Amino acid sequence: MKNAMQLKAIMKKLAKETQISAQLVLQNYMLERFLERVSLSPYRDNYIIKGGFLISSMVGLNSRATMDMDATIKGYPVTQDAVQKMIEQILTVPVDDDITFTFKNIGEIREGDEYTGYRVALTADFPPMAVPLKLDITTGDKITPREIQYDYKLMLEDRHIQVMAYNLATILAEKLETVISRSDQNTRPRDYYDVYILTKLQAENIDFPALGAALMATASKRGSDSILQDYRAIVEAVRNSEIMRRQWDNYRKDFDYASTISFDEVCDAVASTMDTLITNNFFN
């Protein structure tokens, strides 16, 4: 990339093609630039990507975009000092892309009173552009049976980088557990969208016995085993919630790729996936 003007033009073109904002495309590109540094670092086996950034890679930027990167750490201490040291070392890995990264700050992530990990703020610098980025780092996640080596396809080059990642069964299991256990208290419509889009675009890759095992492991870790048994009633309660429908309508307005999908369709995706697991005794 010769200069920022050239990069901006490419980002605008991609934004038009994918129907998402140029800023969001740019953030995804810069997160990818960070990920290449991870792949070349001594921490490549410790840093396991998950969440929206990984889902976006699986289904395409035109079907899912995100503003941050979620990862879980394995085989390395997850304290504030250790995480900061790891990220700062990753940022020094030489890559021929003329982008430099600045570590800004790190802080605990809390959901209520519960500590869930660390949030790291970075800036990706490609003068005169300075793009703010966010990494959410956790540890102790239950990956069933284990993380995989994932070929991440680059946005602007015809090549892949190899990184460690959640497998599809665990991604889907965590999403299913979240939407069912949180019922109509879930404030994140994207969780429903992710179940919908993964079951549509990755249908041929879903291993239902593996998904059942991953869902049982996730539910056991989160203490939601009994709640998941009531999935039919919970999905219907969610389907009939005016608040949840309003949240979904707002999500559809914000993201063009969700604009034609009804709330009933995403609820159906959750229910039918669970039906398949229960009917075949893959989850009990």
What are these regions (language model features)?
Residues M1-Y47, S56-A65, M69-N284:
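Structured mid-to-C-terminal alpha-helical surface segments
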